[in-house]
């Protein structure tokens, strides 16, 4: 409950700044990005540095819904010079901030940054912009909004003769199932770890649900886990996941393939 209240407070603060027009000032914009990063690291994303065990040196990590680069910067550090990160972010201002963050950390050479959305099929999609919340831009369901390129993860990572992904992070405001549908070959043949945000209301906008995501990934042999600060990542039951979503509004879940 506290986490949800704080998240809403941060979003409300940005809304006030956006309505005032002060967000257009570079210093204010940088300050908000810094505040957002602190919020993500300490209150929302949980013990994300534990994801490093799924992103070894020389590996390929994919950040779907990269926003301003909170995860992409970390992934790029972890893969080191012999690895690669694919960062996908469709919104212009966020994409520019993503590139700036990577340049600032001298990591841009390790990242293939795409101004696009990941979807079930390649082509063109439409993005609804939320001017009051830079992390709440959504795919349109009715063809309105800003036209953006759409790509499938399978098209970005051919399964023959290329590096296979070790981790895919997905946070796309309810369109997670569409991303997964466009990654069927990756899920089947590579079986990377997945770190996915589950938000019942957001998923419902696209005609799906938390239960549907769990079932879909179970069909590929994935099991849900809590990302733990220490020790093994504990298995998360469907009932526990639904309870956490009901309490907090959303939850981040680590999915790994079951051991044979």
Region locations from a protein language model:
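Phosphate/nucleotide-binding beta-alpha loop and adjacent structural elements of enzyme active sites
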Residues: 1-260
């Amino acid at each position: 409950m506290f986490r949800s209240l704080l998240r809403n407070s941060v979003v409300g603060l940005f809304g006030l700044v956006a309505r005032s027009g002060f967000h257009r000032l570079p210093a204010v914009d940088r300050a908000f990005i810094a505040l957002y990063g602190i919020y993500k690291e300490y209150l929302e994303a949980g013990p994300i540095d534990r994801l490093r065990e799924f992103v070894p040196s020389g590996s390929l990590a994919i950040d779907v819904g990269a926003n301003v680069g909170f995860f992409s910067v970390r992934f790029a550090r972890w893969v080191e010079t012999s690895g690669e990160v694919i960062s996908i972010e469709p919104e212009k201002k966020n994409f520019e901030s993503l590139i700036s963050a990577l340049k600032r950390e001298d990591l841009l050479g390790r990242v293939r940054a795409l101004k696009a959305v990941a979807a079930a099929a390649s082509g063109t999609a439409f993005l609804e912009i939320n001017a009051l919340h830079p992390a709440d831009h959504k795919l349109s369901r009715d063809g309105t909004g800003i036209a953006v390129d759409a790509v499938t993860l399978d098209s970005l990572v051919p399964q023959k003769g290329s590096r296979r992904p070790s981790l895919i992070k997905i946070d796309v405001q309810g369109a997670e199932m569409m991303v997964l549908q466009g990654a069927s070959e990756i899920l089947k043949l590579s079986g990377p770890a997945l770190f996915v945000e589950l938000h019942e209301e957001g998923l419902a906008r696209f005609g799906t649900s938390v239960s549907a995501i769990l079932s879909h990934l179970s069909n590929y042999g994935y099991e849900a886990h809590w990302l733990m600060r220490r020790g093994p990542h504990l298995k998360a039951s469907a009932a526990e996941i639904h309870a956490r979503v009901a309490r907090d509004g959303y939850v981040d879940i680590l999915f790994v393939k079951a051991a044979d």
